[in-house]
UniProtKB/Swiss-Prot annotation:
It catalyses: (6S)-5,6,7,8-tetrahydrofolate + NADP(+) = 7,8-dihydrofolate + NADPH + H(+); 7,8-dihydromonapterin + NADPH + H(+) = 5,6,7,8-tetrahydromonapterin + NADP(+). It holds the Pfam family adh_short_C2. Belongs to the short-chain dehydrogenases/reductases (SDR) family. FolM subfamily. This is Dihydromonapterin reductase. GO terms for biological process: one-carbon metabolic process. It comes from Escherichia coli O6:H1 (strain CFT073 / ATCC 700928 / UPEC).
């Protein structure tokens, strides 16, 4: 008998940085991947050439979220996992309407995973005990709060809470966990002074890079028992 085709892993926001690194990690393991992207970065062409299914999506509206869900439903009969990596970063600053800031943060970090988890639930079920996963990417600020990014922190805290609710709803077929990172990697334009200030915020004083996230994702995917948990990835920052 031929080998059964693996079910794809869905990664939202997979066109750059951590999402892109995760996509390549799974592709290199011969694991089918579906990636959402909003902006067509050159890296998307590389993913497509490597066999990934890349779907352009606009998560700024609920209609856009559901249109993306419909495309996923048309493309596969099942999913191995959903990794909710799509994110946005908006601060409260002069001239930015506060209602717009809050609505934007809640839309991408709460409405989008909430709607996708419900819409794609049937693709995750029916594959066996603890055979599927949902992983939410939250943030270190869920624990600490943020005076400069209040809406962002609140939206990530809501996503953290949804982790436990969906874990209760979908067990034992689907494990639902979250990863709460702080600094993982710098942007290219970050200057030396900023980098040193950021590094000093954690005990480990390093930006570990995408591999640290990949290893933790692999751990959650291979576990048959861990669910409803938030795993911090902060280098001991909470002890500073």
């Amino acid at each position: 008998m031929g080998k059964t085709q693996s079910l794809p892993i869905l990664i939202t926001g997979g066109g750059r940085r951590i999402g892109l690194a995760l996509a390549w990690h799974f592709i290199n393991q011969k694991q089918p991947v579906i990636v959402s992207y909003r902006t067509h970065y050159p890296a998307i062409d590389g993913l497509i050439k490597a066999g990934a299914q890349c779907i352009q999506a606009d998560f700024s509206t609920n209609d856009g979220v559901m249109a993306f869900a419909d495309e996923v439903l048309k493309s596969t009969h099942g999913l191995r996992a959903i990794l909710h990596n799509a994110s946005a970063w908006m601060a409260e600053k002069p001239g930015a309407p506060l209602t717009d800031v809050l609505a934007c943060m809640m839309q991408i970090h709460v409405n989008t995973p909430y709607l996708l988890n419900h819409a794609l639930e049937r693709l995750l079920r029916g594959h066996g005990h603890a055979a599927s996963d949902i992983i939410h990417f939250t943030d270190y600020v869920v624990e600490r709060g943020s005076d400069k990014h209040i809406a962002y922190a609140a939206s990530k805290a809501a996503l953290d809470n949804m982790t436990r609710s969906f874990a209760r709803k979908l067990a034992p077929e689907v494990k639902v966990n979250s990863i709460a990172p702080s600094l993982i990697l710098f942007n290219e334009h970050d200057d030396a002074e900023y980098r040193q200030q950021a590094l000093n915020k954690s005990l480990m004083k390093t930006a570990p890079g995408e591999k640290e996230v990949i290893d933790l994702v692999d751990y959650l995917l291979t576990s048959c028992f861990v669910t409803g948990r938030s795993l911090p990835l902060d280098g001991g920052r909470h002890l500073r």
